[in-house]
Structures are given as C-alpha cells and as structure tokens.
Amino acid sequence: MADKVIAYASGLESGGVLSVCKHFPGHGDTDVDSHKALPVLPFTRERLDSVELYPFKEAIRAGLGGMMVGHLQVPVIEPIGGLPSSLSRNVVYDLLTDELAFKGLIFTDALAMKGVAGNGNVSLQALKAGNDMVLSPRNLKEEIPAVLEAIEKGELTREDIESKCRKVLTYKYVLGLKKKSYVQLSGLEQRLSLIHISEPTRLQL
C-alpha cells in the first residue's frame, strides 16, 4: 500500500497539487466512524510502528507535502482518555513532527465531526498541539477570539502563528500558485452548474 500511496501522491505533486496523507496515525483497523464518535486504537506501540504508522513513515521518507491527523484515541501515545489524536501534542508534535521528522503541512480532520466534540475550543487546542491548519471549525466567531486571547496570555506565541502562515505560503509558492491565472468570479455559478453544461461534458463528469 505504501508504494501505491507514494506513486499517487507524487503524481499529484508533480502536477502542482498538494498531497495529504490521512488519517494519521491510522484509521484502517477501527470499527467506529469518527464522523459519529471517537474510534480507539487499542494497540501496542510495536503494532502501531509495524502496521498503522508504516505507510505514513514511507510517505514522510518520500518527502510528500501534507498530513491530516484524524480524530482517534491512541492510549499508548496519549494517556488522557477521550483526547483525540488531532488535539494531542503527544501525537501531533512529539510523534509526527519530532520523532518522525515530518516537515510538511499538518491539517486536522474536520473539527465539526463528533469524534472531536466535547473538547472545548478545538481550534485553539489543535494549534497548540502542533497542527498548521484547522479544517472546518464549528464556530469561527468564538474560536478566532479564543486564539487571539491565547496569544495575549502567552499560551500561543505570535511567532507560532506566523511560522504556520509562512509554511502555508511556502507550499503555495512551491506548488506554483503564483503562476496560475485567477478564476474569474463573474458567472462562476453558471459555469459550474450541471444545468448549463453540455451533454457530452456532463457524461464525462
């Protein structure tokens, strides 16, 4: 599987599309949908290293650009019961960034999912855990002020946020975003609507 991941992701990135491997540290051998609840990976560290983490390690070794951290409970790495891996500094920073030396962009899974519910301000926790980007926060009106307040209190530093921003901008530059022409917003909805697409084109979709 790792070979297929690397081949597919390398193809994406060679075409200017960021590849994002998911769901770290492994969502394959679970019987719970993290959209609905928090899955548990009740395995030993040896098992995680040899099975769940293996394809991610290979992707990191190949230099692929993105990683999405899933909402998973991994007791052998994060001892706090009920704390999802996406909000765990033990998982995001200590394991992914430090131990596995991943230098690319780190995304959370969608923060509106039930697998991460009940953990307070999840955007703030995700940033403190080491994620670079938070996906689909539930309530931006509450979560942005909480991040700003955390900076004022010293729980996060302005340098932390600026570092994440530079990382995002660097990847946009490397992937050639600056070279792309901008999308014309005028008439965009009409162009994207299936009603206005010719029959042969619609069949191709």
List each language-model region with its residue ranges.
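Flexible, acidic loop-helix segments that line cofactor/substrate-binding pockets
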Residues: K179-R191
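Short amphipathic alpha-helical segments with coiled-coil-like heptad repeat character
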Residues: A59-A62, G176-L177, L205
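A glycine-rich phosphate-binding loop feature that marks nucleotide/adenosyl-phosphate handling sites
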Residues: G28, I144, C165, Q184-G187
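Second-shell residues forming the walls of enzyme active-site clefts
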Residues: M1-E149, T157-E159
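Mid-to-C-terminal alpha-helical segments outside catalytic/metal-binding sites
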Residues: E152-K180
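Single conserved hydrophobic/aromatic residue that forms the stacking wall/gate
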Residues: I195-L205
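Charged/polar, solvent-exposed surface patches and flexible loops
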Residues: D94, E149, S163, T170, ...
